[in-house]
Regions:
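Hydrophobic alpha-helical transmembrane segments of membrane proteins
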Residues: 1-44, 52-194
């Protein structure tokens, strides 16, 4: 990132670059994706408990959020402070990283339910070799790339990087709300059908 200091005006882009880099790393921390498939042949144990499908799915999502979201936010905070971002940029970098972690968990739950494989031989299959995991990683990467392309080609003349980060946080929050709604409705029905 020191290279960008040599280009006039590029220091304003550092928060966007930090969010993109951390977002790509967050996309590889899909803890919620294999959580459905890892139940395997013992899924009947969870289904026999007096818990609704929504409670089970929320618990799996909470585990992902407990591990990924705080670490993502702290990483965003440390990097934003280390690179001398403005206070507003620090806030939006931290929020963006947290929302990307949440989006990763929600997208992982949806993909994990859609492409659940309960007939695996070793735990490596759902954790490292599943279609759900690939679609989750590629989906979050696509969101990050689409955000970068949106700013670079359409909104760069209209918005400052800080304003775009605020808009991107809003878009991420809306995506999270939509995916959460899908998880507790469609996802609960899909869980019952497994």
């Amino acid at each position: 990132l020191e290279f960008f200091a040599l280009i006039p005006g590029s220091a304003l882009l550092i928060p966007l670059i930090l969010c993109a880099a951390l977002g790509l790393l967050i996309s590889m921390t899909c803890l919620s994706t294999p959580s459905v498939s890892l139940e395997g042949k013992c899924i009947w144990i969870l289904k026999s408990l007096p818990l609704s499908a929504q409670q089970i799915l929320r618990a799996k999502l909470r585990f992902h959020n407990l591990l990924v979201v705080p670490v993502s936010m702290v990483a965003g905070l440390i990097l934003a402070l280390a690179y001398g971002c403005s206070p507003a940029d620090v806030v939006f970098t931290v929020l963006t990283c947290g929302l990307l972690g949440l989006l990763c968990g929600l997208l992982g739950m949806i993909c994990g339910l859609q492409w659940a494989r309960l007939d695996w031989l070793t735990e490596a299959h759902p954790c490292k070799q599943s279609a759900a995991l690939i679609f989750t990683m590629l989906g979050l990467t696509a969101v990050i790339v689409a955000g970068g392309l949106l700013y670079g080609f359409a909104l760069r003349a209209l918005l400052t990087p800080t304003e775009f980060l605020a808009l991107f946080c809003l878009l991420l929050a809306l995506m999270c709300l939509g995916l959460y709604r899908a998880m507790v409705t469609w996802g609960a029905r899909k869980w019952e059908a497994l």
